[in-house]
Amino acid sequence: MCASRGDEKRAKSLRDSGEPARVSSVDTVPFWRPTAAWFPATAWFGMATRVGGVSAGPYASLNLSLGVGDDEAAVRENRRRLRAAAQVPEGGPVMLHQVHGRTIVGADEGGRDADGFVVSPGDPWVAVSAADCAPVALVAEDGSAGALVHCGWRGARDGIGPAAIERLGERGIRAERIVAAIGPCLHACCFPIGPEVAAEFDPAFLLPHPTGQPSLDLPGAIAAALAAAGVPAARIEMAEECTASDPARFFSHRRDRGLTGRHWALLHLAPRP
């Protein structure tokens, strides 16, 4: 876990929510999952850690990407284990061709150039891939609609979180009725950035780094954008885990200079009676 300017607000949010976020096992695959009492029980959101698979070397052990140089048979076994653990039907989850943008599509539009889904109860399971970027789930408090987005610094700059809120608004969900969870990602302790990127962000989310460069508080910036768009700040849960500073549990593209695996973060809304 890394310190950042958002830690005090993050800690208060977690205290208000009850139990702090944690990594817990589903069968043999550990997932980070939100634990706030206000997160709808009918919404399944979680990010797999790197533990519980069969891949070796820099991909050990639950790499889920076929595009990073890992053995194909190992990746397919890892995906089978993840589906079995989370009870995702064969053939799922629906995925995207992620492009670090702000486009959000429906669960029936898998494979498109996009970085988020908007879903309804009973839609197929959806997932985004990450290894430092933040997976963010936004769900109506009654579980009637939800969104899952992949958000790195470009997504934070371009407002993919508020874009998801707009898409939920098209379904009649007011922002004040949305709850959110931001999964493990790169934190300010490990996210030095150059002046060009720093200029894109409010100085409130830029912290000093030992390199002398400013460092980005990515989850803090995401949470602030959601709150500014109307999501109650007390109902935004942020993972304390930093992917780069926890090599035992998380892949990190930045820490490992690109030679690493990928996590999946999943979202599913249970069918309504």
What is the predicted role of each segment?
Residues C2-P273:
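Active-site microenvironment for binding and transforming phosphate-containing groups
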